[in-house]
């Protein structure tokens, strides 16, 4: 059964907070310990306890790491994963998280991936947090992970390298492209481990996704927040609601008054080739009464940077506006049906519990041309084939 999990990071995110939340949502401690035993790290011992913060019950996770620990490099950690008895999927996901932290630390400290030594990532508690969270996804059979935007604090903290600003430089590197917002707190809210888990494992960011809720879990952090709010992370686990699909998109806009609109079809072609979800051009009246156009491009998070470059290259725009929005779409698929003119490609959407056939313009245009028929007649015949359940 497909399952979805939403991370509600109202007070930030760390590895131990995520791990505690998954345990509170139903992961058995014994099952998690059995999975971590596959790492063959004898000193790794989990300590869990139920705590209360602002009247809310949560699970706090600690790793018994009283023994002196050696600093580890990324190759050391990857070797531990490869020599473990973990499933290949858990190994791959954990490796992505460790590599995300290593890449950020190497960038910040001006060294290579192989040479960077981890003061945090090489410790047993961080290894347990990373591998433990990935194991929890497997144990709960979660295949979709959605996360709220992350809060970013201000101020300074002390670390092994000295006094550094918040957000920590490594966190800033890891969270490139991840939605976030500023808060007035002068305490660390997003740790490098938490940031890397989110960056490597989360598939989408935004509001609470449609789901049939099965469980809620709270994981506790290690500090008390100065503003009095609970230092907790909340997760929701459920089954996806197939009625609506929700995702975060980036809306890119620019106003143009000196651009030749004859180039618009070519621009659309380039934008769609590079992943644009939609492109539109609307007439507007600009300053001094000039007629102009507002070009709007809707993009997925992973394609937005390249699409912005294309707009600046192919138009006379001197700048762009962009913002994050959310969109809901009906579930849809492409299929082939039998028509009076042979097999035709159409769209099928789920609308109000019914399946509805929508004609494809290019297919209808092809048939109209081949059979010398009015385009609207072909459209009407295909729409007449609609069936409802």
Swiss-Prot record:
**What keywords sit in the KW lines?**
Nickel
What the entry lists under InterPro entries is as follows: Ni_insertion
Q: Name one GO molecular function term.
A: nickel cation binding
Which pairs are disulfide-linked? Answer: none
Q: Which Gene3D superfamilies has this protein been placed in? A: mk0293 like domain, Transcriptional regulatory protein pf0864 domain like
Its family remark reads:
Belongs to the LarC family.
Q: What name does the UniProt record give this protein?
A: Putative nickel insertion protein
């Amino acid at each position: 059964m497909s399952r979805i999990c939403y991370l509600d990071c109202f007070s930030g995110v760390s590895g131990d907070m995520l791990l505690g939340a998954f345990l509170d949502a139903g992961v058995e401690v014994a099952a998690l310990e059995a999975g971590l035993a596959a790492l063959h790290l004898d000193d790794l011992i989990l300590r869990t306890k139920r705590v209360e913060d602002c009247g809310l019950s949560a699970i706090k996770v600690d790793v018994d790491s009283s023994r002196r620990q050696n600093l580890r490099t990324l190759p050391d950690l990857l070797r531990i994963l490869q020599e473990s008895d973990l499933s290949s999927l858990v190994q791959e996901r954990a490796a992505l998280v460790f590599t995300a932290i290593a890449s950020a630390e190497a960038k910040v400290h001006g060294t290579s991936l192989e040479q960077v030594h981890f003061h945090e990532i090489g410790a047993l508690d961080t290894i347990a947090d990373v591998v433990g969270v990935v194991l929890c996804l497997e144990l709960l059979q979660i295949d979709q992970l959605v996360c709220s935007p992350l809060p970013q604090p201000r101020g300074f903290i002390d670390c092994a390298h000295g006094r550094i600003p918040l957000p920590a430089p490594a966190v800033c590197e890891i969270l490139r492209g991840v939605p976030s917002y500023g808060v007035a707190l002068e305490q660390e809210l997003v740790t490098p481990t938490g940031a890397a888990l989110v960056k490597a494992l989360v598939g989408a960011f935004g509001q609470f996704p449609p789901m049939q809720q099965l469980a809620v879990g709270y994981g506790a952090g290690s500090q008390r927040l100065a503003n009095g709010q609970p230092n907790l992370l909340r997760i929701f686990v459920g089954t996806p609601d197939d009625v609506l699909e929700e995702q975060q998109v980036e809306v890119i806009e620019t106003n143009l008054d000196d651009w030749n609109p004859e180039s618009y079809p070519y621009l659309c072609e380039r934008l769609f080739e590079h992943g644009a979800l939609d492109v539109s051009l609307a007439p507007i009246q600009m300053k001094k009464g000039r007629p102009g156009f507002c070009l709007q491009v809707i993009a997925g998070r992973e394609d937005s940077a390249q699409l912005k470059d294309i707009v600046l290259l192919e138009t006379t725009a001197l700048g762009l506006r962009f913002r994050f929005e959310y969109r809901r779409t009906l579930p849809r698929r492409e299929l082939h049906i039998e028509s009076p003119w042979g097999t035709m490609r159409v769209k099928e959407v789920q609308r109000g519990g019914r399946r509805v056939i929508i004609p494809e313009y290019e297919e209808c245009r092809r048939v109209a041309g081949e059979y010398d028929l009015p385009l609207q007649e072909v459209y009407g015949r295909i729409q007449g084939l609609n069936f409802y359940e």
